[in-house]
Regions:
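Short glycine-/small-residue-rich flexible loop motifs, especially phosphate/cofactor-binding loops
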Residues: 50-51, 123, 160, 221, ...
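Generic preference for hydrophobic
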Residues: 98, 135-136, 249
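Catalytic core of membrane glycerolipid acyltransferases/transacylases, capturing the structured
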Residues: 107-172
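Short catalytic/ligand-binding loop motif for oxyanion handling, primarily in non-cytosolic enzymes
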Residues: 82, 86, 119-121, 143-145, ...
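Short acidic-hydrophobic, aromatic-tinged amphipathic segments that line or gate anion-handling sites
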Residues: 95-100, 166-174
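Short, contiguous strand/loop micro-motifs
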Residues: 37, 109-110, 166-167, 206-209, ...
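Non-catalytic C-terminal accessory region of glycerolipid acyltransferases
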Residues: 103-105, 128, 132, 172-291
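Membrane-anchoring hydrophobic helices of lipid-metabolizing enzymes
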Residues: 1-113, 118-119, 155-160
Length: 291
């Protein structure tokens, strides 16, 4: 065990974002904005994100990108503690602006979101709208969490909380398609992200992304087609001045539309251009373009 790595994990995953559990959100954001100036925070994550983002986008203010990346990570990690210690219904009403509406409860859907901005509040909103959904997830490893045992424990806690928030067991590979079909057959939803590395799935397909030939996983669309479930694309962005989230819910889409993955890629690109520092998977972005 490397004590320095454990201390870093304690600070980055628990102590600092945990401030949101004890302070009002307005005060927490004021603290987070000051902490985000600290270049030591979320190293080497933010330098790697900046280096990769610069290969695909024009980053005019690198210092601002780095600061906003750190701030977004603080907010995303804080959402775990807000989920534990705040009423999600009251918090959504006060701090999350919802644009659009979910399909009526009882209508089976496949939800598509991205690792751009915090992910918990879309899941909370969907659950409160009457939809229980199984989330496609991946296991955390100690290596993926900074080689720290505390980081790994945090990741496990986050997955367990996500399962509680969504209302259904998480879906891990192998057997993703079969498990997802069982959920849809039982009138539950399935939600996941199409921006994970394409090489981890057999269902990647070509798209245009950032004006380049690319590929994105199409497993969620395949799940929707097999289950004849409508597809809803949604995302959560953050006003970094106030910490207020904006949850945008798209209109239901036909899973058999041949242009559906292109539509997903278009929304993904829009988010990357609007708030590139909010994307937490820049370290994997090169894999989209290995076509």
């Amino acid at each position: 065990m490397d004590l320095r790595l454990e201390v870093r994990a304690l600070v980055e995953y628990i102590a600092l974002p945990g401030i949101a559990a004890v302070l009002p959100w307005r005060w927490s954001m004021a603290v987070f904005r000051r902490l985000a100036r600290w270049q030591w925070l979320y190293q080497p994550e933010w330098p790697g994100a900046l280096a990769t983002a610069k290969r695909y986008l024009a980053i005019d203010d690198e210092a601002a990108f780095a600061r906003d990346f750190r701030l977004t990570r603080l907010i995303d990690h804080a959402d775990l503690y807000l989920t534990w210690f705040r009423s999600r219904r009251r918090y959504l009403a006060r701090h999350v602006e919802v644009r659009g509406t979910w399909p009526a409860a009882g209508q089976v859907l496949v939800g598509v979101f991205f690792h751009v901005g915090p992910g918990f509040w879309g899941v909370h909103s969907l659950r409160l709208a009457g939809h229980s959904s199984a989330v496609l997830a991946g296991h955390y490893s100690r290596r993926s969490m900074g080689d720290a045992y505390l980081g790994w424990y945090y990741g496990v806690a986050r997955l367990k909380t996500l399962q509680w928030a969504s209302g259904r067991p998480l879906i891990f590979s192998p057997g993703t398609l079969a498990k997802a079909q069982q959920e849809l057959d039982a009138q539950h939803g399935v939600i996941g992200t199409p921006d994970v590395p394409p090489e981890i799935t057999r269902y990647s397909q070509p798209v245009q992304l950032l004006h380049r030939p690319a590929q994105l996983p199409a497993g969620l669309i395949e799940i929707a087609r097999r289950g004849n479930a409508q597809v809803v694309i949604y995302d959560t962005q953050v006003d970094l001045a106030t910490g207020r989230r904006v949850l945008s819910i798209g209109a239901p889409l036909d899973p058999n539309d041949q242009a559906l993955l292109a539509h997903v890629a278009e929304r993904f690109e829009t988010l990357l251009r609007e708030q590139p520092s909010a994307f937490s998977l820049w370290s994997f972005a090169d894999s989209y373009f290995r076509v």
